[in-house]
């Protein structure tokens, strides 16, 4: 599980005619395209560029791992003819109406746009928490296409999606999907360097669904909420100390300072005790290192995935060393069971919701939120 994906309401009307989808090439390695249009100003994203060329939109994704482009998409309304002289790229006729999603993260975003009907297939259905999507799976309105690591090709072919939304990885392909004719929307937002940068990808996805204005408006709300919370916390003179996560086998993995959660903890007004670990992933530490640093921490936040909720008693049964930390002794542990709490599905594109949750824990008088949605105080 990567930390960048932590690692999510508006409505729009999908009014275009029958979707036509044509492929015009794969990944793009050339420099950014120049067309007679307006480049949309990105507020926080460093990997995404959108250019409105009047009759179509060019979306370019920078390669997060090396110089050049990861992909270029050409978004042309299905009600219009394909313009002549467009640059090389993957042609997508918008709005997309028949999509296969590898993650529930994007399904929740579709729903916020009012475009849930565009979700026709998903992978890893057993991990999806959202009741509305589980109901659509049960009714057969959404197809379970198997594991994202071992896709059911027959079901994908039967679905014949307009596009497949999947996460790219360095030097990695999409397995069986690579052999099919369907275009892949490479969802590289998790490689952004900030929570608001990742959330800004909703502006790209909104344009794929014919909801560009809705997405722009929603993103403005996200940024406004986020900045208001961050500003309110910035003036706090007291910043409670924070430890996080659990020991896993021989290592205790904690978010690095530059990871999504590492940034969020600090922006929420906590004195994150592992902030000296730079980088953007998770850092493996020994139990002894964590104990030396965090024995007297004020708060302990952790996430886990289990069919049964954990308690301090069950933690102690797993590892007796937990008893040596102050939050264990005084009950100041806040836990999120991601098997039943949609933290990952909802907050990837709504970092303002996650920030509000954390501020409610550390500085409840400042958040304006009375109840916690994702975390619970561990009994």
Task: Give the location of each predicted region.
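Bacterial N-terminal signal peptides that target proteins for export
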Residues: 2-12
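Bacterial N-terminal signal peptides
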Residues: 11-23
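Flexible, glycine-rich surface segments
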Residues: 224-314
């Amino acid at each position: 599980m990567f930390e960048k994906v932590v690692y999510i309401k508006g409505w729009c009307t999908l009014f275009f005619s029958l979707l036509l989808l044509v492929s015009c090439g794969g990944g793009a390695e050339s420099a950014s395209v120049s067309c007679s249009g307006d480049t949309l100003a990105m507020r926080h994203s460093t990997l995404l560029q959108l250019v409105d060329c009047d009759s179509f939109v060019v979306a370019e994704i920078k390669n997060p791992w090396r110089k050049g482009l990861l992909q270029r998409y050409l978004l042309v309304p299905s009600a219009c003819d394909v313009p002549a002289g467009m640059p090389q790229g993957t042609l997508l006729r918008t709005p997309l109406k028949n999509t296969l999603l590898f993650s529930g993260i994007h399904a929740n975003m579709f729903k916020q746009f009012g475009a849930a009907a565009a979700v026709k297939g998903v992978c890893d259905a057993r991990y999806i928490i959202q009741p509305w999507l589980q109901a659509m799976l049960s009714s057969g309105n959404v197809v379970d296409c198997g594991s994202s690591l071992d896709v059911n090709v027959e079901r994908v072919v039967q679905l014949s999606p307009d596009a497949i939304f999947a996460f790219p990885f360095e030097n990695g392909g999409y397995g069986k999907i690579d052999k099919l004719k369907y275009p892949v929307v490479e969802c590289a937002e998790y490689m952004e360097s900030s929570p608001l940068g990742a959330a800004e990808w909703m502006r790209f996805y909104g344009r794929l669904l014919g909801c560009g204005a809705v997405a722009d408006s929603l993103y403005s709300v996200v940024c406004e909420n986020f900045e208001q919370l961050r500003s309110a916390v910035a003036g706090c003179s007291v910043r409670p100390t924070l430890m996080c996560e659990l020991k896993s086998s021989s290592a205790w993995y904690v978010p690095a300072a530059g990871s999504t959660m590492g940034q969020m903890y600090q922006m929420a007004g906590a004195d994150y005790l592992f902030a000296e670990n730079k980088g953007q992933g998770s850092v493996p530490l020994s139990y002894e290192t964590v104990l030396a640093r965090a024995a007297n921490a004020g708060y302990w936040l952790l996430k886990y995935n289990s069919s049964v909720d954990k308690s301090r008693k069950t933690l102690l049964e797993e590892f007796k060393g937990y008893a040596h930390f102050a939050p264990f002794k005084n009950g100041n542990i806040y836990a999120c069971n991601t098997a039943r709490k949609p933290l990952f599905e909802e907050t990837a594109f709504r970092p303002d919701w996650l920030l509000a949750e954390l501020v409610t824990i550390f500085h409840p008088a400042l958040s304006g939120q009375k109840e916690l949605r994702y975390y619970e105080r561990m009994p």
